[in-house]
Amino acid sequence: MKRVLFALLVATACVPALADLALATAKNCMACHAIDKKLVGPSYKDVAAKYAGQKDAADKLAVKIMKGGSGVWGPVPMPANTQVNEAEAKKLATWVLSLK
């Protein structure tokens, strides 16, 4: 019984991470980013490390996701993502920051 409960607990913990990866894929984030390697943009783990310990990091990153930016990660700018609403941007930012 303990093994079954443990397996359910682990599986339940993975569902939000998979849902957030699905959201990132649906919103085309994964065209330029990967979790653990640089593509066109930085890896999400690098983004999480850069924002680690910053006050209001999720809010700052959510704005960056929606409005884009340039000059932080090199010469290629991140375009604005008009297909991402505020709630989705906050969810994506929280997910990215959770990656270690």
Identify the function of each model-found stretch.
Residues 36, 55, 68-72, 99-100:
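A general structural signal marking secondary-structure boundaries and capping sites
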Residues 50-60:
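Short microdomains enriched in Cys/His and/or Lys/Arg
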Residues 22, 96-100:
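Short hydrophobic/aromatic patches at helix-to-coil boundaries
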Residues 1-18:
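Classic N-terminal secretory signal peptides
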Residues 18-35:
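Sequence/structural segment immediately N-terminal to covalent heme-attachment motifs in c-type
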Residues 31, 40-51, 64-93:
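Axial heme c-ligation environment in periplasmic c-type cytochrome domains
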